[in-house]
């Protein structure tokens, strides 16, 4: 299209450049510029043919770029001139936004997304007085960047520090409910997700750094947690509960909006980033409370998706499994080695929430063969059996005995050997007997999930069958074939695990038979696991599968008679 078709626009651009060179503080000079800019901007809305002509002209984009560049001169503005200045910058960016809806290739080629960010940062610099228009300028920049990058995504890492500055601007900014908030969040989250899709950006964003400067982590925490993640927490505040001595996310109370879904998509992309584990470890040290809440959200995201690929599964396990290792080998044994008076209740709440989130993530991902192989290769069976043993020796077994209805008439509290607990301080720290709930100090539901994971690992895996027995895990599984309100349905999970441990494994069957002879094993547990004790002529004892016919001499019954 001939240049004279853009005559009005080019004259406007020339006027802006001339004003910025001569006297950017002259309020009167802005008046005709703002008026003409508004008229031309409206034409980009109403005249589709003209809008497309401008959008497809590289020359027009270059002139628009040069004009916005001219607005970034290091000239100090007073309060009166800052308002029309900001309005002019916003008008140019809104024009760019409308054109980018038609053409993304040219503005990306010219790296205009970088210029938009620079334009906003200049408007918030010491050269420009802060005005209420800044917030509207930011939303204009977001929507412009949204349009530029909706089909083409280019991240210029040379501008990474400026990009972080731009992304952290909303920290502490109050948005009006309704249209303003919606216009902010969707493009903001889209942009952040776009940047996270760039491996170079995401790895640099979450990368650990040895610098003692708090600003390095502060800006990242502000963007990822205080802005993005906090939006979900704020919207779902009724789902994040700290009650009955526990801290957890009740997903039955979630009411996910389109904005919340975008937040979760950003988090989903983040948790598979190679450097995410280092960021997570650092966040736990800097802000333990935020770490716990974030881990609960990670648990929700990971367990809600069914199609993780191998790379993503490895990335998730690379941060989740080390947390479990540390808890199992260090933090939890240390917790039980201390007196009840040596720690605050919040310590147990933090430990329990962190452990349960990690266990639940791993248990859910065990449906993938890749994760099972990962766990076996990293000696997880030894760690899980050791943790189960720690819990077995230290947790109280609790039974809420109810009469008619849901009223608890009596609470039975014993140790792992069935001995009644008399220590009133210990009971107080573990159970609220007045309201009949179990505190985090007794790590409710944790043994249950450990056994679920072990069942996944041992299924059709003879080496793991033997390893669990050799580590003492078979005895632990047997001893949990009981009803325990600290771990509802642990009996059923233990029976499933026991079935997998015994299947086609003579040594495990022999071990169980010896335990049964000592009245350690409950017959109903064996029965539900698909086995039964068979006493034959001469007093010989066999543990046989209920699927086999013990009277059939040709059936493949494994004899476990003692010599």
From Swiss-Prot:
Chain positions with Phosphoserine modification: 559
InterPro entries: ARM-like (IPR011989), ARM-type_fold (IPR016024), Ataxin-10/CTR86_families (IPR051374), Ataxin-10_domain (IPR019156)
Places the protein is found: Cytoplasm
Modified residues (Phosphothreonine): 433
Gene Ontology cellular-component annotations: cytoplasm; cytosol; nucleus
GO biological process: cell division; regulation of cytokinesis
Highest rank taxon of the organism: Eukaryota
Location (main, coarse): cytoplasm
Keyword Disulfide bond: no
Keywords of this entry: Cell cycle, Cell division, Cytoplasm, Phosphoprotein
Region Disordered, annotated ranges: 544-563
Gene3D superfamilies named among the record's database cross-references: Leucine-rich Repeat Variant
Purpose: May play a role in the regulation of cytokinesis.
Family assignment from sequence similarity: Belongs to the ataxin-10 family.
Miscellaneous comment in the UniProt entry for this protein: Present with 8970 molecules/cell in log phase SD medium.
Protein name, per record: Ataxin-10 homolog
Organism: Saccharomyces cerevisiae (strain ATCC 204508 / S288c)
Taxonomic classification: Eukaryota, Fungi, Dikarya, Ascomycota, Saccharomycotina
